């Protein structure tokens, strides 16, 4: 994946005396590319990491870019203009952090979209790593509070001028590129959670159930997937796929549409049919969840990459309970974000 170090990096220039307001001086940005990924253990990517997450909050009509406004938040403690974000709490994923912190700071409910990347900068004796998404405001109301006393909704060019920090400006510029090619469909492509060992299962493999960890993964997928406001759920035939998204279906109050074309067997025996079924989900528009197996997922994504505008040249990963957030415009893949696990990052 682009801009994703595979080993712990040293804190950039950390003197032990730097504050949040010094982040431009020694900060780094990892915002390049429409292919983004979160490491399996993001807290170990840098030394003494403080993890945080947030979003570029926006409102307006993406089909009319001139109507888009973004939220600039004023923090009285720092007397600065910045983006909504906050630190990870125990027992939550980065996606959950982004949604919770936005609600706490601004009062707004959001629907997350594209992962923009991350910024990295030293604060005191730690390395602060902040992941940013785009986040469409879908409800709620701002009430001034101790953390944020004012919010200004501005067109992007005015927001860029108001922002205090260059790092935040670069996040905004990345969001602007995403707004210029708006998503008209998004698929949350989930691999089923962990199931009982195949070698110790004597029955029909389609009936092999989730194990204890798999059941926890399926429960933790609910807040993660809900952050993107899915409208419908599809699943391959195996029960481990259906059971992975069953808690989400209960939360949404909807049925899971089961189709054999989303499974590994279809990818082997009827690749054309499997591609057609996935294309139907794209053409339905909006946001959908598709739960599948580990064999078909890399194949479908590679096919989408070849057909779209997003080249993916490296190995396509699909850990159990992982999520690929796939973004489409006019039926073509324009963005892909890999979230390797729904489990807490701390």
Residue ranges and their predicted role:
Residues 65-109, 201-208, 213:
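Conserved Nudix-box catalytic region and its N-terminal flanking loop in Nudix hydrolases
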Residues 86, 97, 184-269, 298, ...:
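Active-site-proximal alpha-helix that buttresses catalytic centers in soluble enzyme cores
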Residues 53-57, 322-325:
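Short beta-strand scaffold segments in enzyme catalytic cores
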Residues 109-117, 255-259:
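A short coil-to-beta-strand element that immediately follows conserved catalytic motifs
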Residues 2, 18-19, 79-80, 143-197, ...:
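Nudix hydrolase/Nudix homology domain
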Residues 275-334:
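Active-site-adjacent alpha-helix immediately C-terminal to a catalytic or transition-state-stabilizing loop
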Residues 2-54, 60-62:
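Acidic, metal-coordinating catalytic segment for phosphate/diphosphate chemistry
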Residues 88-111, 119-170:
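Unchanged
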């Amino acid at each position: 994946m682009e801009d994703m170090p595979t080993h712990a990096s040293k804190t950039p220039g950390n003197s032990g005396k730097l504050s949040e307001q010094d982040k431009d001086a020694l900060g780094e940005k990892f915002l390049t590319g429409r292919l983004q990924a979160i490491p399996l253990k993001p807290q170990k990517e840098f030394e003494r990491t403080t993890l945080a997450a947030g979003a570029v909050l926006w409102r307006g009509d993406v089909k009319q870019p001139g109507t888009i406004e973004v939220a600039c938040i004023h923090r009285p403690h720092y007397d600065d203009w910045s983006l909504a974000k906050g630190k990870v709490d125990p027992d939550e994923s980065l996606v959950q952090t982004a949604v919770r912190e936005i609600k706490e700071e601004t009062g707004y409910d959001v629907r997350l979209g594209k992962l923009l990347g991350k910024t990295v900068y030293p604060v005191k004796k730690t390395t602060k790593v902040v992941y940013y998404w785009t986040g469409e405001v879908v409800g709620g109301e701002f009430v001034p509070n101790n953390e944020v006393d004012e919010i200004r909704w501005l067109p992007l060019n005015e927001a860029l001028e108001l922002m205090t920090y260059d790092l935040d400006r670069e996040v905004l510029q990345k969001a602007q590129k995403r707004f210029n090619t708006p998503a008209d469909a998004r698929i949350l492509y989930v691999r089923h959670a962990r199931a009982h060992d195949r070698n110790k299962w004597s029955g029909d493999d389609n009936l092999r159930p989730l194990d204890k960890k798999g059941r926890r993964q399926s429960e933790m997928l609910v807040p993660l997937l809900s952050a993107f406001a899915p409208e419908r759920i599809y699943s391959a035939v195996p029960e481990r796929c259906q059971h992975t998204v069953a808690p989400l279906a209960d939360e949404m109050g909807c049925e899971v549409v089961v189709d054999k074309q989303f499974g590994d067997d279809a990818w082997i025996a009827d690749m054309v049919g499997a591609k057609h079924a996935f294309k139907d989900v794209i053409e339905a528009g909006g946001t959908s969840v598709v739960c599948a197996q580990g064999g078909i997922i890399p194949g479908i994504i590679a096919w989408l990459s070849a057909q779209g505008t997003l080249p993916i040249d490296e190995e396509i990963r699909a850990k159990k309970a992982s999520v690929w957030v796939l973004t489409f415009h006019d039926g073509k893949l324009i963005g892909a974000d890999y979230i390797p696990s729904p489990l807490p990052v701390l």
